[in-house]
Every structure is written in structure tokens, then in C-alpha cells.
Amino acid sequence: MDLEIFDDTNSVPAEKIQLVKDVLEFSGKYLELPEDTEMSVTLMNNEQIHEINLKYRGVDKATDVISFAIEEDDPDELPIILPDDVDFEEPKNIGDMMISMDKVKEQAEYLGHSEDRELGFLTVHGFLHLNGYDHMKAEDEKVMFKLQRDILDAYGLKR
């Protein structure tokens, strides 16, 4: 996977950033995504994610993770036309994810598990949203949460 990870807090330890990268690469392989799949992750604080949550979702509070999936087949987007002899496939950018590192700490403490487990959980949760999974309906929630648990267990971040 082609990952861009940004630390907007300027304080996330390198090993936490590496954990996000490793979990995403593992998750991408688990879902059998193409190697050239692209996405970005921004690690931020509660104040920063609160602003984004309010601006884009109309929710006036901090949250733990927000995912913005890139919609495929945008009818307003013009196709790229290449000569017939050029073999080119554009990498698939699945979108952007934001994680509140403050929420990672708060929720790990509240749930009684490690910050690594919480960070891994939020990373997989947001990643699945970017890949079209959601939990708006009970049946969809069942599918998403099972897959989430399976990925985390296979990676070794069990509860």
C-alpha cells in the first residue's frame, strides 16, 4: 500500500506511527487490495478532529476516527485518455482517515486495554469504512464488526 501518515500533533511517537502503517498494510493484504492502493491518515488531537467533525459532519464534538472515502466513478470527472499502446492503470486512492490520539488514550483507559490495541482498532475501523463497510444497519454492523475482530485477532491485537 502507498500510505501517507501525517502527525498534526507533532508528538506521536515513531512506534505508534509505525503501528498504524503496519496495521494498514496487514489489513490491505487481508482484504486482498491491490499493492498500489493509496490512502492517507492524519493523527490529530481532540480539538482538531472536533473542527473537522463539525465542518464536514455537522457534529459539534470530538470523535475518535473519521473516514472520508473517495467515491469511485464520479460522473463529473473526465476520463484520462491514453494511447492504445500505453498500459497504465491508475492507483486506487481509497480516501483519507483522521484519528484523534487524545481519544485513543481516553478510550484505552476507559476500556482497560492498551493504547496500541485502541489505535489498531480505530485504524482498522476507519480503514473498513474507506473500503465500503458500515454499521448503519444491524446486518451490516455484524459483517463489519466480525471482519474488524478477525483482522485485529490475525494481526495479534486481541482484546
Curated annotation (Swiss-Prot):
It is found in: Cytoplasm. It holds the Pfam family YbeY. Zn(2+) binds at residues 125, 129, 135. GO terms for molecular function: metalloendopeptidase activity; RNA endonuclease activity; zinc ion binding. Its main location: cytoplasm. Binds 1 zinc ion. Its EC number is 3.1.-.-. One of its GO terms (biological process) is rRNA processing. The keyword Hydrolase applies. GO terms for cellular component: cytoplasm. It is an enzyme of class 3 (hydrolase). SUPFAM superfamilies: Metalloproteases ('zincins'), catalytic domain. Keywords: Cytoplasm, Endonuclease, Hydrolase, Metal-binding, Nuclease, Ribosome biogenesis, rRNA processing, Zinc. HAMAP family: Endoribonucl_YbeY. Single strand-specific metallo-endoribonuclease involved in late-stage 70S ribosome quality control and in maturation of the 3' terminus of the 16S rRNA. PANTHER family: ENDORIBONUCLEASE YBEY, CHLOROPLASTIC. Belongs to the endoribonuclease YbeY family. NCBIfam families: rRNA maturation RNase YbeY. This is Endoribonuclease YbeY. It comes from Ligilactobacillus salivarius (strain UCC118). The gene is ybeY.
